[in-house]
Regions:
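P-loop NTPase motor domains
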Residues: 1-219, 234, 244, 301-322, ...
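Conserved ATP-driven motor cores of ASCE-family P-loop NTPases powering translocation/secretion/packaging/pilus
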Residues: 211-312
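Conserved small/polar residues in nucleotide/adenosyl-binding loops
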Residues: 412-415
Length: 415
């Protein structure tokens, strides 16, 4: 689950694999760490992507001063967190990729991940939306109480599109786990993922596998695309598997030549019978012959000229049908505005300060007194905690001094 979550945020087909894969490992490591710590400290309710983002920004950009063999060294705070974890920790293993990287390579990994998850720091609406949970995915499969979850994704804010793909991925995985509790590993109620503008959604991890095995668990996908090129662009080689595992094809209209050719081919051919005649130009026809040939049921060029309100459906193991449909706006169904729907979202009033994980508890364990080989006692504290610095300075005996460093303050006293 955590691996697929990391894939949603870091997948990038345009860059070299090392950067998204390294960024994914770093993100997975931080998620696993905060989950483990949240469980141990009783703060699981505060584990969210907003907390992950703040953990990364705060600890990834600050250094602490450590004494190693009598020498002061700047050590990244994020490195210190994972170094302190016990051997065999899943979070520590996932962090190894970025731990091994140095210099510009390490900076590029950190920059890549910072860009991938920046939405949780720059978009307060998303931070609040993901700060808690009001949805029990298992209720979607309750045959006695039908339920639908409607996602409203603003087309003008592409940065928010990743949330829709993330929701679909997590919902699918949760329902698969729930299906395993039933005989035959099949949900008691069908669940449809109706994904409008599927071609514009951020890639959903393992989509080809989901659509292949999902039907056996009563998990069905309805994918709406403008043309098949969108599918090929997004999913590359997996696009063919996705297409071939759709049991129903519904064609409304397209001007894309390749899409029309594919659909015309999927509809199949029809057989026509015709007669040919031969003979001299100025005499009676002396020969005639009958023959048969196959032609497309509907030619690609005819598909693009279908009248408005017409649709062609090809169902698996059935002959295609030509039908008509009524546009939604003619059905007289009242639609709610986004503002009306938002009134039911309790999380929009959440204070982010109350939902963030208590990161100070992590800082307190990182900065501990250290004694060097000359007897000097050191204690590092963050510069943004002036009250703590003053308190520690007053606690030390006469002659203690404070050295101000770029990131933190190092307090030391003579032996």
């Amino acid at each position: 689950e955590v691996q697929s979550l990391g894939t949603v945020f870091t997948a990038d087909e345009q860059s070299q694999p090392i950067w998204p894969e390294s960024a994914k490992s770093l993100l997975v490591a931080m998620i696993l760490y905060l989950l483990e710590k949240g469980y141990d400290d009783g703060n699981l309710a505060n584990v969210s992507m907003y907390s992950i983002y703040n953990l990364f920004v705060e600890f990834g950009t600050e250094n602490e001063v450590q004494i190693v063999n009598g020498e002061k060294r700047n050590v990244n705070a994020l490195d210190s967190i994972f170094k302190s974890l016990p051997r065999g920790s899943a979070a520590k293993a996932a962090y190894a990729t970025s731990r091994f990287a140095e210099g510009d390579c390490r900076a590029s990994i950190f920059t890549t991940l910072s860009s991938d998850i920046s939405i949780f720091g720059s978009d307060s609406g998303i931070s609040r939306l993901t700060s808690g949970n009001q949805i029990n995915f298992e209720e979607l499969a309750d045959p006695d109480h039908p339920m639908a979850v409607i996602m409203i994704v603003p087309d003008e804010k592409k940065s928010r599109h990743v949330i829709a793909s993330l929701f679909v991925n997590q919902c699918y995985n949760a329902l698969v786990d729930y299906a395993n509790k039933f005989i035959g590993q099949k949900l008691p109620q069908r669940v449809h993922f109706i994904l409008d503008e599927f071609g514009n959604m951020v890639n959903i991890p393992d989509m080809d596998t989901k659509i292949t095995v999902g039907a056996g668990r009563n998990l069905l996908f309805d994918l709406f695309v403008q043309d098949l090129n969108q599918l090929d662009t997004k999913y590359n080689n997996a696009a063919k598997t996705i297409r071939s595992n759709t049991g129903n094809l519904v064609y409304i209209n397209s001007l894309d030549v390749d899409t029309n050719k594919y659909f015309s081919s999927a509809l199949g051919d029809r057989t026509i019978e015709y007669t040919t005649y031969s003979g001299d130009l100025h005499s009676f026809l002396s020969h005639q012959a009958g023959s048969v040939d196959s032609v497309p049921l509907i030619r690609p060029e005819d598909l693009s000229e279908l009248p408005f309100g017409t649709a062609i459906t090809k169902r698996q193991r059935c002959y295609p049908i030509k039908t008509v449909f009524d546009p939604f706006y003619k059905l007289g169904i009242k639609a709610q505005s986004i503002a009306e729907i938002a009134k039911t979202m309790d999380f929009r009033y959440n204070s982010l300060e109350e939902t963030i994980y208590p990161l100070d508890s992590i800082w307190q364990k990182l900065f501990i007194p250290i004694k060097d080989n000359k007897g000097y006692m050191y204690k590092a504290v963050r510069r943004k905690d002036p009250a703590e610095i003053k308190k520690l300075t007053e606690t030390y005996s006469h002659g203690s001094q404070t050295m101000v460093l770029p990131i933190c303050c190092l307090l030391y006293t003579s032996p």
